[in-house]
Regions:
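Conserved phosphate- and dinucleotide-binding cores of soluble alpha/beta proteins
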Residues: 1-172
């Protein structure tokens, strides 16, 4: 699946979000132009980890640039030490080549990866997702525009809740 081109507005939003992400954070990036732009804007960060539902090409780029250098702190008793944690991967041939026999990856059940209480044990967990509508009070809708259904939420609500419960965590 080819990566979509990132539009200028996505890059601006991604840059704004990246300014609010600290070094040594644990990342969850959703699907779409903005999460891809955030990954591109994080290239100067240090000591980052991955605990995400979906592993993407942007995360591989962060790993190859030396940004991803640690594993998330989680409730698994050390089983995931030294690994990037995800439930599935979606991307290009480059991503699938990175997955092949990579001992630094742990693809786990989505029910565990997206469990807010597991996520909350990751220090500075940051959840970044795309939404379709935002109202004046800040409520978001990620499934539809008006009455037309576009997608489901997937693990978005779980990862956002887990990030808010995490010490130093944030959700965008």
């Amino acid at each position: 699946l080819p990566s979509p081109d990132t539009e200028e507005r996505d890059r601006l939003i991604g840059g704004f979000i990246a300014e609010h992400i600290e070094n040594e954070s644990t990342l969850q990036l959703g699907i779409g132009g903005i999460p891809n732009a955030v990954a591109g804007a994080l290239m100067q960060k240090k000591g980052m980890a991955i605990h995400t539902e979906m592993l993407t090409d942007g995360m591989v780029d962060l790993f190859e640039a030396g940004v991803i250098t640690r594993s998330p702190r989680s409730t698994d008793g050390g089983l995931m030490r030294g690994k990037m944690v995800a439930a599935f991967a979606l991307g290009t041939k480059k991503l699938y080549g990175f997955l092949d026999r990579n001992p630094g990856l742990a693809l786990m059940r989505g029910t565990w990866v997206n469990d807010p209480y597991v996520i909350a044990h990751n220090r500075k967990q940051v959840s970044i997702n795309t939404t379709l509508e935002v109202d004046l009070t800040g409520q978001v809708c990620s499934e539809s525009i008006g009455h037309r259904q576009y997608s489901g939420t997937g693990g978005q609500s779980d990862t956002a809740i887990g990030a808010q419960m995490s010490e130093g965590g944030k959700s965008f």
